[in-house]
Regions:
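ATP-binding glycine-rich loop module of kinase domains
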Residues: 59-81
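Activation segment/activation loop of eukaryotic-type protein kinase catalytic domains
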Residues: 169-205
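Conserved N-terminal boundary motif of the eukaryotic protein kinase catalytic domain
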Residues: 34-45
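Short beta-strand micro-motifs within the conserved protein kinase catalytic domain, predominantly
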Residues: 98-109
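Structural motif in protein kinase domains
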Residues: 116-126
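Catalytic-loop of the protein kinase fold
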Residues: 152-170
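Activation segment signature within eukaryotic-like protein kinase domains
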Residues: 140-141
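Conserved N-lobe ATP-binding subsite of Hanks-type protein kinase domains
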Residues: 53
Length: 417
């Protein structure tokens, strides 16, 4: 058993390896291998922020491109463990990123997942008029509402529905809209379908631009709030703006209060002016939902389908960006040192402190919930570590068993001879 443990420890040390090479511009490139299954180059950085870094990697066996997220354990509000748990529950559904591997390493946690395309905010900004056509908006509405329905059916609410949190897929999934970023996602009921209790006095959680009126009022979020946020997002897609987009305030609290007042002032028929009446009907319905009430998703999907039919629109997946040849999914390789990447990973020295400069899209989270997330993530991280240890010991035992069987067969062959 001691030899098994030693070999298991040896395998752990080889879970991640690296080598350095120079590219044509003489820039140092770190190549990091993960469990001999995946690898990524330090130059293939897709993005990053306060949560960590994301790289484009590759599956060494299938040569399939993947996304590799790296998160420091020292960040204030960790996300990867929480996100991986939710995505694993949704792994069999369309429009949710597939998770291939979650593994801890010293001061970082690594998650390997499906590589996706641009988010809807970037696609909107790349469009000629900084807005989408009615056709694209309605096709998006149907897919996004379907994602929200699936999420809710799995007892979760997203709590941060906005354009940046939906992306297009790649290759054969290019017509699929994916829901991403589950940092604020929470369960609204348990396995016995007991709904979370109604509460007041909550701080705004999510992004103020798309937050529901109930969220602004400090009421605990439920399914209805995700749906109201979707409505604001659809208005934004069609018009390229929201009436409260340029609201300013001396403090966050003053600004958010002004945004709430603007939302209360804008009745659905005024907010949806110039759009099909189905948008107006959508808002009237979702704003009247009760805290624990289950939304009629098929009714809402029917509204969007009805709007398409009345406007002679076919759901043929010919989105606006398909016509724009300038849109691509190039990597973003900015502001990140490639020097000794592997040693920095081991030591947890990567700078995870980049801030989002778009203040109007600032994400908020209740302080009490930060502590809840941290405690929950500690438990889940220990589960992942223990699971990895058990898997390694199990693999080693299988190897030893196979080796014993081979030796037995060999000895029998010798005896027969």
């Amino acid at each position: 058993m001691e030899s098994t443990q030693k070999e298991s420890e040896k395998e752990t040390n080889n879970d991640i390896s690296n080598k350095t090479e120079k590219n044509t511009s003489q820039q140092k490139v770190e190549i990091v291998k993960i469990k001999n299954q995946y690898s990524f180059k330090s130059t293939d950085r897709l993005g990053g922020g306060s949560f960590g870094q994301i790289y484009k990697g590759i599956n060494l066996k299938t040569k399939e491109e993947v996304a590799i997220k790296i998160e420091s354990k020292n960040i204030e509000t960790p996300q990867l463990i929480h996100e991986s748990k939710i995505l694993k529950a949704l792994n069999d559904n369309d429009g949710f990123p597939k998770v291939y591997l979650v593994t801890p390493l010293d001061d970082v946690l690594i998650m390997v997942m499906e590589l996706l395309g641009e988010n809807l905010q970037k696609l909107l900004m790349n469009s000629p008029h900084k807005k989408f056509t009615l056709k694209t908006t309605l096709m998006l509405a149907i897919q996004i509402l379907s994602r929200i329905k699936t999420l809710h059916e799995n007892n979760y609410i997203h709590r941060d529905i906005k354009p940046e949190n939906f992306t297009i897929g790649l290759k054969k999934y290019k017509n699929t809209i994916y829901m991403i970023d589950y940092g604020l996602t929470r369960k609204f009921c348990d396995s016995r379908k007991n709904h979370i209790p109604y509460k007041e006095g909550k701080h705004l959680t999510g992004t103020a631009l798309y937050a529901s009126i109930y969220t602004h009022k400090g009421i605990e979020q439920s399914r209805r709030d995700d749906l109201e946020s979707l409505g604001y997002m659809m208005i934004y897609f069609c018009k390229g703006e929201l009436p409260w987009m340029n609201v300013k305030g001396k403090t966050k609290e003053i600004k958010y209060k002004k945004i709430m007042e603007k939302k209360l002032e804008m009745k659905p028929d005024i907010l949806c002016q110039g759009l099909p009446d189905e948008f107006n009907q959508y808002f009237k319905y979702v704003r009247e939902l009760q805290f624990t009430e289950e939304p009629k998703y098929d009714f809402l999907l029917g509204l969007f389908n009805s709007a398409m039919k009345k406007n002679n629109i076919k759901n043929d997946f010919k989105f606006d960006w398909c016509q724009n040849s300038g849109i691509n999914n190039q990597n973003i390789n900015d502001k990140f040192s490639t020097e000794s990447l592997f040693s920095k990973l081991k030591l947890g020295e990567i700078n995870f402190g980049e801030k989002n400069e778009k203040k109007e899209n600032e994400i908020n989270i209740d302080k009490k919930e930060k502590n809840e997330i941290q405690n929950e993530n500690k438990e889940q991280k220990n589960d992942i570590i223990n699971e990895n240890k058990e898997n390694k010991v199990s693999e080693q035992l299988k190897k030893e068993e196979n080796s014993i069987n081979e030796n037995t067969i060999h000895e029998n062959d010798i005896e027969q001879k």
